[in-house]
Amino acid sequence: MTTSTPDIQPAVQHTAQVAIAGAGPVGLMMANYLGQMGISVLLVEKLDTLIDYPRAIGIDDESLRAMQAVGLVNDVLPHTTPWHAMRFLTPKGRCFADIQPMTDEFGWSRRNAFIQPQVDAVMYHGLQRFPQVRCLFSREVEAFSQNGDGVTLNLKGPDGERETVRADWLVACDGGASFIRRTLNVPFEGKTAPNQWIVIDIANDPLATPHVYLCCDPVRPYVSAALPHGVRRFEFMVMPGETEAQLSEPHNMRRLLSKVLPDPDRVELIRQRVYTHNARLAERFRIDRVLLAGDAAHIMPVWQGQGYNSGMRDAFNLAWKLALVVNGKAGEALLDSYQQERRDHAKAMIDLSVTAGHVLAPPKRWQGAVRDGLSWLLNYLPPVKRYFLEMRFKPMPQYREGALLIDAAGKTSPVGKMFIQPQVTLESGESVLLDEVIGANFAIIGWGCNPQWGLDAGQIARWRAIGVRFIQVVPAVQIHREQDNAPGTLRVGDTQNRLKSWFAQHNTAIAVVRPDRFVAALAIPQTLGAQLTALAEKMTLATGDTARTEEKVA
């Protein structure tokens, strides 16, 4: 595919293995992971700095696990509020749906409030760890072309000067209005909500109550959310005929805030903005050497806080695959699994977000009355109440095709689902989360057995070439028994008995876990060799002889 290019000869030419368009959260996460794996990256952003105003306010356990994988979670956590409940209220203030999951199966609180600009800044500063990763601001992509060898981008710099970038691959993280997606003529079908919302952020929280509340007022629905560092967010529906300029006038701002505050004049306004809620999904996520991620691939209403988190899932899913391909350790066909695995789940999250929006602001007033009455009755049924409290309605990613081996158990199988992350005990006696042992790698995790047993030297070399960690899990009381140590296998103690319970529940002994923490295959010691051979073929892995064995971790 070729686009028109300016006739002016560029003064500056850049090269990189991967070019990323857009320094938002998805582009920053991609750059951090690829940098960690030794890939040269050029990140280009048309703005002159990172966006400094709050947008997303919810980060989930899967996204925190991605932050952990790139070594940034400890810097991110101070900008979060864990265990952040979401409560739907009737116009009279009665809570009819309380979403307050207390599970930590993936190592972190499932629902967390956060300040996005500060977390974005953490990811941006994280790039300084990698000398081969560069970020160029004030660079607009004017045109690009691709062939079988790579992608060429034509950039316009801050003073109008022309620059070119030559990269093996391009990841488009350039937002919902993606120039790259539009240039490639990829359909972006869906709907735009008829009503806009005005978002008001206030410092020194004048309300200071915890959690987030969605008030289903038929006159003007609104949201009230407590955020870290003393920030309060209010969101009000913009009614027909109202404009951002009108609502931003002092007397109208006072009128809005009087619904939620006893003294709307005593506030420290940070900013206000009007947003439109869209629900759209790209028809394709990969177009030859160009890959779409984040809002460039899908956009959704904010009501479940999943736009940001869906973008993080894209980055975590795509980055490790792209690293393998760029480093010559897997064939390009592995990248086809990105769309296979991510598109259906992104659509499910869009549908959930649209439904939540209809609960908050039903299109018809009578639907609100039915909602209130039905929810009041259902809350007296313990299973229904737990369904909301534990956030079981959230579609958890479960891949049924892609870079994995589906087994006969089908939907009940853990293959294609995220592996748990409990605390484990090291041989030193230290207690850590499991991912700290795995690192940014594949892991072959066996309960009570050495997962290398039964594998031939060629298989071990092939998987070590892509950085696999062989891990043996034992009861914590056995961790100091040196006679059980096997060369090349890490041993951890099952501190909380959760790993034993997981393997028992699924009637298996060994799990092959991908770098994005999804289970790729199951086995017992006698079948692991055959499973690894089949999985390597499915992922088009290079053989142990041809793969570059050095592990590039900054």
From Swiss-Prot:
GO terms for biological process: 3-(3-hydroxy)phenylpropionate catabolic process; 3-phenylpropionate catabolic process. It comes from the Bacteria. It holds the Pfam family FAD_binding_3. The keyword Metal-binding does not apply. Disulfide bonds: none annotated. Gene3D superfamilies: 3.30.70.2450, FAD/NAD(P)-binding domain. Keywords: Aromatic hydrocarbons catabolism, FAD, Flavoprotein, NAD, Oxidoreductase. Catalyzes the insertion of one atom of molecular oxygen into position 2 of the phenyl ring of 3-(3-hydroxyphenyl)propionate (3-HPP) and hydroxycinnamic acid (3HCI). This is 3-(3-hydroxy-phenyl)propionate/3-hydroxycinnamic acid hydroxylase. It comes from Klebsiella pneumoniae (strain 342). The gene is mhpA.
